[in-house]
Curated annotation (Swiss-Prot):
Gene this chain is encoded by: ALA8
Protein name (Swiss-Prot/TrEMBL): Probable phospholipid-transporting ATPase 8
Coiled-coil segments: none
PROSITE patterns referenced in this protein's UniProt entry, alphabetically: ATPASE_E1_E2
Residue ranges annotated as Extracellular topological domain: 94-97, 322-358, 941-954, 1028-1040, 1091-1107
Gene Ontology molecular function: ATP binding; ATP hydrolysis activity; ATPase-coupled intramembrane lipid transporter activity; magnesium ion binding
SUPFAM superfamilies per the UniProt record, alphabetical: Calcium ATPase, transduction domain A, Calcium ATPase, transmembrane domain M, HAD-like, Metal cation-transporting ATPase, ATP-binding domain N
Length: 1189
């Protein structure tokens, strides 16, 4: 079986290239120094020297708490919040005589809130502990002292142990691969748990350790880097039989990755437990807090200030009243209080001290102004909101079986306030599914038909004729029959016709480069014989497929060769040719090119290279520039058609030159220093010169479904969209037109360094002069752009004002991001309707995002799909990852994940708007209900000469926030909708309510606070004045303290819950149950609590059953007070809807009118003034925000 497998998998010797073979000529200067001090004794963990090193064991714990520290550590986490600290202090003081109520009544709500959070933390930690136990107790085979493999638990592994891992098992630690079931020591690894990628990685063992028979007797020593978090790097040396062998990431198998398609592997443990790279990466992502949450903290501080002010005011009046209780001649004013025989708390002779102690009492008494359950309620609401986002079927992508995912619940409401979206292009706006559509060879363009971008652009400009539509449709039918990745048609070269072309030899060389210059893996289906390719990028896959379809089939590769089925251009027959693979000069974002060095069957050394035009044309030899002008013209046309282009070149290398270069290159590869990569790039740079131009490729990356409509809708919502792409300027501009980012009639402001003066300075090689001239050029262009937009900005409120689109390339962006120019660049950018940054590096993407976020102070959202977008996602206020073809790094670094860009429309305009509105209304209501309750205590205190006696029973106050008013507000935060999802999408301008923070402005917050204070005044004074002098009992007695307290408290509970009912726009049965159920729970509590013995129920004893409930006055006063307390809000809302309606009010009124009248626009006849005022106000604000200072 193993032999058959080896035979069938010969092709998989991919990474056993000669360039990866170990060499003993290594500089070990850094081994043993700081950062490179780890020593591993292979297969000898009991070595005395190994024992002295005392490395960590393989036991892993990801829990936050232990049984010993759970209570203190969890309590510490809870009391980091200022409000909780306040309530804790109050709880302690409640045991003193200063307390206006009993200690248990204070402790109960605090314990409930803290306890609920601690239970949540404990449950989550128990889940983590369960996962840890499962992982630590997994079994793995380890080589024992007897020379046989025995099973042991993961947690018992030690550094230096030799282990055997079987197919589909996870690696228990970071291992050095010694051998595998394959002859050449390779294995396939799935790294889903590390980076989210599902495609298999290929690893290979050093040739010296790949012999399975001698593996049990293997002894060696590894000196390598210390534990670190870098998943894709490893520096070390293996000392074996007197020789030194450099180690690379290709030999390292990381913990929690899985062995696939390989029967077994042998490995030696290098890093264990928390030293493994996966555990080194187990850190929390950057903490992000929404602007609403930050503002909420400010409101809490305001409430604390109000608390201190009213407590101080009460203590001053109390001190004055206490001082007056005894006049200078010793006469007592309030003799019935016996001020001559009292404690310091009421002693007229020590009035200042009495006032101070009263101040402390008042701080506790009015503490209900601070909402103790606010934070917990918001956490619950946000989690439930996240569940709704995750379950939204409209954001589920059936083709990939990927739903939307809220990876954090902290930023739900922030989704409703996004001002600027910064988007990657490839894989985000486009499908990242490359198709070979055109090419230029020897100055001749090949490939028929129009691209998707060309069609969209011509349709937008109204230039598309019926004949062109028919031609393109016929080509589309051919494309549907083509294989994936190849939508090319040109009768001159398909089906082997290229051999009849006058430049057939150059065509042969062109496609030969495409078939050889790559790192793809051929996979042959044993049943059908069909070959598929595993490539590092969709571009590479498209090139290999294109070369195969045009007669150059890549079918096998080993560590030293690449084999092709080729069409011979002389005979037209297929022949097999084997090319010896010597070195691969890998692609990187800085190099922007890739090359391979091969020896062809004629024994000639060839360098085959492909790369970006910005770097390749500079490397052409003088005699290799034939057809350069034509090729550049074709590249420009391809870019205008939205295609991605690469330049294809080659050169023949002299044998002597190669020998000298190879020695330098190999020396660079075997270095163990920080500048190793730079030295490798420098060596590669020396051979990649004097190239001969063959032509260029053009691949199409089609737009994702629904992207233009999504961008159009977001633009209507007033959201600005920036595209940050690595593409050429022409490509980016035309993609911008195709996806509606740029529109016909929009004036483009192009900022670039393509000027003859700067090019002349570059040729002279004067870098300082180039930098200075470039800086001045960008400064001038930015100021010219500012002058163009100035007139429009001054008249921004006018309809149909001119629109601008800013396009800036990567070189220009480098200078625009300079601290001296960034302010001008940003001000110009935010005056434009669309911004495209071309040729952007990953670092520039992150810097632009930071500039927009910090410079505007508004909410930014970054969206991308690749590892190069991670910095941008983490820098933005909100990071959205696209789960696309470039792995899952972006998703794992994001706050929200969606499968397609078009789902961003619903995520923002629907869920963002709802969450923003729910959270803001929820917070405002929280402060309203606490002020309405807390100020009734203050008014009663003032009425009772600030005696320090609360108006209510202790347990009434304790249960207010926890039981009688908490559930309705949670229901509000989860279920309320001002308008339906359909209307959110139909009227995108509604989204501006969140962007402009209309619903959480200081005006609105203070308005709700004022509403609470007014309600408290009405409740208190109306209750006092209607009940204090009236006969309440049948025997003529007036109300006492306990009845008055129950009546006021009932009025508060009814008022705040009815206020909730009239504030809600979208009722569900859950909200009905919670609102009216909370009122019912209050009466149920009153009956049960009042039936307890008087020693416990105190003033509540039978007060409702025997006194309040039987009295008609109680119910009459309750109705009158509640109605009167709600009347100011009713009045305000009626005025607002009539004269200053909010945009959602207009929509709701319009929909209501449409349902009751046949005329669909009847509301516009009834509310013209309101509509025009509101729309004008929104547009004015929308334009005004574009002027940044």
């Amino acid at each position: 079986m193993a032999g058959e497998r080896r035979k069938g998998m010969k092709f998989s010797k991919l990474y056993s290239f000669k360039c990866f073979k170990p060499f003993s000529r290594e500089d070990h200067s850094q081994i043993g120094s700081r950062g490179y001090s780890r020593v591993v004794f292979c297969n000898d963990p009991d070595n005395p020297e190994a024992l002295q090193l005392n490395y960590r064991g393989n036991y892993v714990s990801t829990t936050k708490y232990t049984a010993a520290n759970f209570i203190p550590k969890s309590l510490f986490e809870q009391f980091r919040r200022v409000a909780n600290i306040y309530f804790l202090v109050v709880a302690f003081v409640s045991f003193s005589p200063l307390a206006p109520y009993t200690a248990p009544s204070v402790l109960a709500p605090l314990l409930i809130v803290i306890g609920a959070t601690m239970v949540k933390e404990g449950v989550e930690d128990l889940r983590r502990r369960k996962q840890d136990v499962e992982a630590n107790n997994r079994k793995v085979e380890v080589l024992g002292k007897t020379g046989t493999f025995v099973e042991t638990k993961w947690k018992n592994l030690r550094v230096g142990d030799l282990v055997k891992v079987h197919k589909d098992e996870y690696f228990p630690a970071d291992l050095l691969l010694l051998s595998s079931s394959y002859e050449d020591g390779i294995c396939y690894v799935e790294t889903m748990n590390l980076d989210g990628e599902t495609n298999l990685k290929l690893k290979h063992a050093l040739e010296i350790t790949s012999d399975e028979e001698s593996i049990k007797n293997f002894r060696g020593m590894i000196k390598c880097e210390d534990p670190n978090e870098h998943l894709y790097s490893f520096v070390g040396t293996l000392y074996f039989e007197g020789k030194q062998y450099p180690l690379s990431p290709q030999q390292i198998l990381l913990r929690d990755s899985k062995l696939k398609n390989t029967d077994y592997v042998y490995g030696v443990v290098v890093f264990t437990g928390h030293d493994t790279k996966v555990m080194q990466n187990a850190t929390d992502p950057p903490s992000k807090r929404s602007k609403i949450e930050k503002k909420m903290d400010q409101i809490i501080y305001i409430l604390f200030s109000i608390l201190i002010v009213i407590a101080f005011t009460g203590s001053v009046f109390f001190g004055i009243a206490t001082r007056r209780d005894m006049s200078d001649n010793g006469k007592l004013r309030r003799w019935y209080l016996r001020p001559d025989h009292t404690t310091v708390f009421y002693d007229p002779r020590r009035a200042v001290a009495a006032a101070f102690f009263h101040f402390l009492t008042a701080l506790m008494l009015y503490g209900y102004l601070i909402p103790i359950s606010l934070y917990v309620s918001i956490e619950v609401v946000k989690v439930l909101q996240s569940i709704f986002i995750n379950q939204d079927q409209e954001m589920y992508h059936e083709e990939t079986d990927r739903p939307a995912r809220a990876r954090t619940s902290n930023l739900n409401e922030e989704l409703g306030q996004v001002d600027t979206i910064l988007s990657d292009k490839t894989g985000t706006l486009t499908c990242n599914s490359m198709e070979f559509v055109k090419c230029s060879i020897a100055g001749t363009a090949y490939g028929r038909g129009m691209t998707e971008v060309e069609v969209a652009l011509r349709k937008q400009k109204g230039l598309m004729t019926q004949e062109e539509v028919g031609d393109n449709e016929s080509l589309s039918i051919k494309e549907q029959k083509a294989v994936k990745g190849f939508n090319f048609w040109d009768e001159r070269i398909v089906d082997g016709q290229w051999i009849n072309q006058p430049n057939a030899e150059l065509i042969q060389k062109f496609f030969r480069v495409l078939a050889i210059c790559h790192t793809a893996i051929p996979d042959v289906n044993s049943d059908t014989g069909e070959i598929t390719y595993e490539a590092e990028s969709p571009d590479e896959a498209a090139f290999v497929i294109a070369s195969r379809e045009l007669g150059f089939e890549f079918f096998s590769r080993s560590q030293t060769s690449i084999s092709l089925h080729e069409i011979d251009h002389m005979t037209g027959e297929k022949v097999d040719r084997v090319y010896e693979l010597l070195h691969v000069l890998e692609f990187s974002s800085s190099r922007k090119r890739m090359s391979v060095i091969v020896r062809n069957p004629e024994n000639r050394l060839l360098l085959l290279s492909k790369g970006a035009d910005s770097v390749m044309f500079k490397r052409l030899a003088k005699h290799g520039r034939q057809n350069e002008r034509e090729t550049k013209e074709h590249i420009k046309k391809y870019a205008e058609a939205g295609l991605r282009t690469l330049v294809i070149t080659y050169r023949e290398i002299d044998e002597d030159e190669y020998i000298v270069w190879e020695e330098e290159f190999l020396n660079a590869k075997t270095l163990v220093t920080e500048d190793r990569d730079a030295l490798i790039d420098a060596a590669a740079d020396k051979i990649e010169k004097d190239l001969i131009l063959l032509g260029s490729t053009a691949v199409e990356d089609k737009l994702q479904k629904g992207v233009p409509d999504c961008i159009e809708k977001l633009s209507q919502a007033g959201v600005k969209i920036w595209v940050l792409t690595g593409d050429k300027t022409e490509t980016a501009i035309n993609i911008g037109y195709a996806c509606s980012l740029l529109r016909e009639g929009m004036k483009q402001i192009l900022v670039t360094l393509d000027s003859s003066d700067i090019e002349a300075l570059e040729k002279q090689g004067d870098k300082e002069a180039v930098a200075k001239a470039s800086f001045q050029s960008i400064k001038k262009q930015l100021r010219e752009g500012m002058s163009q937009t100035a007139a429009v900005t001054d008249n921004s409120a006018k309809e149909n004002s001119e629109m601008f689109g800013l396009v800036i390339d990567g070189k220009s962006l480098t200078y625009a991001l300079d601290s001296k120019l960034e302010k001008e660049f940003l001000e110009l950018a935010i005056r434009c309707n669309s911004v495209i940054c071309c040729r952007s590096s990953p670092k520039q993407k992150a810097l632009v995002t930071r500039l927009v976020k910090n410079g505007t102070g508004r909410t930014t959202l970054a969206i991308g799909d690749g590892a190069n977008d991670v910095g941008m996602l983490q820098e933005a206020d909100i990071g959205v990852g696209i789960s696309g073809a470039e792995g899952m790094q972006a998703v794992m670094a994001s706050d929200f994940a969606i499968a397609q860009f078009r789902f961003l429309e619903r995520l923002l305009l629907v869920h963002g708007h709802w969450c923003y509105r729910r959270i803001t209304l929820m917070i405002c209501y929280f402060f309203y209900k606490n002020l309405a309750f807390g100020f009734t205590l203050f008014w009663y205190e003032a009425y009772a000469s600030f005696s320090g006696k609360p108006a209510y029973n202790d347990w009434y106050m304790s249960c207010y926030n926890v039981f009688f008013t908490s559930l309705p507000v949670i229901a509000l935060g989860v279920f309320d909708q001002d308008v339906s999802a359909r209307l959110c999408l139909k009227y995108p301008l509604l989204y501006q309510e969140g962007v402009q923070n209309v619903l959480f402005s200081w005006e609105r917050i203070l308005g709700w606070m004022l509403n609470g204070v007014i309600s408290s005044m009405i409740i208190f004074f109306l209750t006092i004045n209607t009940m204090a002098t009236q006969a309440f009992r049948k025997d003529g007695q007036v109300v006492d303290y306990s009845v008055l307290g129950v009546t006021m408290y009932s009025s508060v509970v009814w008022t705040v819950n009815c206020q909730m009912a009239i504030s809600i726009n979208y009722f569900t049965w859950i909200q009905h149950c919670f609102i009216w159920g909370s009122i019912g729970v209050w009466y149920l509590f009153l009956v049960i609590y009042g039936s307890l013995p008087p020693t416990f129920s105190t003033t509540a004893f039978q007060v409702f059953v025997e006194t309040s409930a039987p009295s008609p006055i109680y119910w009459l006063v309750l109705f009158l007070v509640v109605f009167s307390a709600l009347l100011p809000y009713f009045t305000y809302r009626a005025f607002q809807i009539k004269f200053r309606p909010m945009y959602h009010d207009i929509i709701v009124e319009q929909r209501r009118t449409e349902r009751t009248e046949t005329a669909p626009n009847a509301v516009l006849g009834e509310l013209p003034v309101q509509v025009e005022f509101t729309l004008h106000h929104l547009r004015a604000n929308l334009s005004r925000r574009d002027s940044w200072n």
